[in-house]
C-alpha cells in the first residue's frame, strides 16, 4: 500500500510536473506577448487616445440604437469564438515558430524606436495632434495669403513701372517724330481747325488722355504717313535735280550741234553755264578767246554735267529699292542713257571728235531720260505708300529670278505630234479641219480659256 501510496503521491506530482511543463511554453509566449511590438503600438498615446475615442463612439452608438447594439454584440461573440478557436489551433505553430517570431519582434521594436524618434507626435494625444495640425494648416494658409498679397502688390508696382516706362518711351518717340518729321501743312490746318472748337486741350494733353495702344497706333500711323511724305519729298528733289541736269545737258548738246554747223546762237533762255558759253561763242574773237578754247570749255562742261547727272541718277537709283519693277525699269533706262552720253564725250578732245549721229542719239537719250523721270514719279504717286517704304521703315523687297522656261518643251506640249489624218493637207486646210472637229455640236464654238490673271503686289486690289 505504501508503494501504491507512493505511486499515488508521485503520480499527482508527476502530473503536476507535466502540466507545468506543458504550461511553460504558454508562459514564455505570454512574456513574448508582453514584449510584442503590437503592445507597444497600442500603448502609444496617439493610438491609445484614438482607440479610446473610437471605442466610446462605438459604445454610445450601441446604446442609442438597440438593434445596432444587438447586432454588434452578436458580431463580437462570433469574433471572440472564432479568435479562441483560431488560437487553439495555432498554438502548436506558434510554439514551433517562436525563434523566428522573436527575431521579427526585435526588428519591429527597433523600427518602432526609430519611428518614435522621427515622429514625436506619436507620444501626444490625438486632440493635441489635431490642434497642432490645425495651427500648422492655418499658418500655411496665412503664409500663402500673405505671399499672394505681396505678389499682387509687386505686380501692381511692376505694372505702374512698365506704364511709366512706356509713357516715357512714347513721349520721347513723339518728340523725336515732331522734331525730325515735322507736321505737314494739311495736318497743321487740321489742328488749327480743331483748336477753334470749344474746350479743346493741347496736343500733349490729348495724348495723355489717350490709352497706350491708341497712342502707339496713332504714332505708328503718323510715322508711316510722315515717312511717306518725307520719302516722297526726297524723290521729288532728286527728280527736280535730275531734270535740271538733263535740261542743262540738252542745252549743251544743242550748243555743240550749233557749233559744229557754224550757226549763230539763238537768243532764247539758257542755264547760267550754258548761257555763258552761248554768249562767248559769237564774240569769241573780240574777247581774245580762240575757237578751240570755247570748244574745250564746252566739252568740259558736257563732261561735268554728265558726271553730275550720273551722281544724281545713282542717288535716285538708291531711293527706288523696293519700288515696283516698272519704276525701277524707268530709272535703269535713265542710267543707260547717261552711260551712253558719258561714253560719247569720254574720248573726245574737240568738237570734231563727236560724231553728229552720236550727238543726235545723245539728244534723243536725254529727251527719253527726261520723260522717264516724269513717268517714274507718276508711278510712285500711283503706288501704295507701304510697299516702297525701305530702309528703317520696312524690309527691302528682293525679287527672286525665275528659272528660264524651256520653249522647245512648251511648244511640244502645245502642238504635239501631227495628226496622220491631215498629213496630206496644207496648213490652212488642217486649221479648218481642226476647227470643225473641235467645234461644239450645238453649233457654238468652245469658249477659249481665260488668260491667267496678272500678278501684282496686292492681289486684293485687282478687280
From Swiss-Prot:
Disruption phenotype: No visible phenotype. Mice lack detectable lipid droplets in heart. The triacylglycerol and fatty acid content in heart is lower.
InterPro entries tied to this protein: Perilipin
Protein location: Lipid droplet; Cytoplasm; Mitochondrion
Region (Disordered): 1-32, 433-463
Ranges where the record places region Interaction with PNPLA2 and ABHD5: 200-463
Gene Ontology CC terms: cytoplasm; cytosol; lipid droplet; mitochondrion
Function statement: Lipid droplet-associated protein that maintains the balance between lipogenesis and lipolysis and also regulates fatty acid oxidation in oxidative tissues. Recruits mitochondria to the surface of lipid droplets and is involved in lipid droplet homeostasis by regulating both the storage of fatty acids in the form of triglycerides and the release of fatty acids for mitochondrial fatty acid oxidation. In lipid droplet triacylglycerol hydrolysis, plays a role as a scaffolding protein for three major key lipolytic players: ABHD5, PNPLA2 and LIPE.
Subunit structure, interactors included: Homooligomer. Interacts with PNPLA2; prevents interaction of PNPLA2 with ABHD5. Interacts with ABHD5; targets ABHD5 to lipid droplets and promotes interaction of ABHD5 with PNPLA2. Interacts with LIPE.
Family from the record: Belongs to the perilipin family.
Name of the featured protein: Perilipin-5
Organism of origin: Mus musculus (Mouse)
Gene giving rise to this polypeptide: Plin5
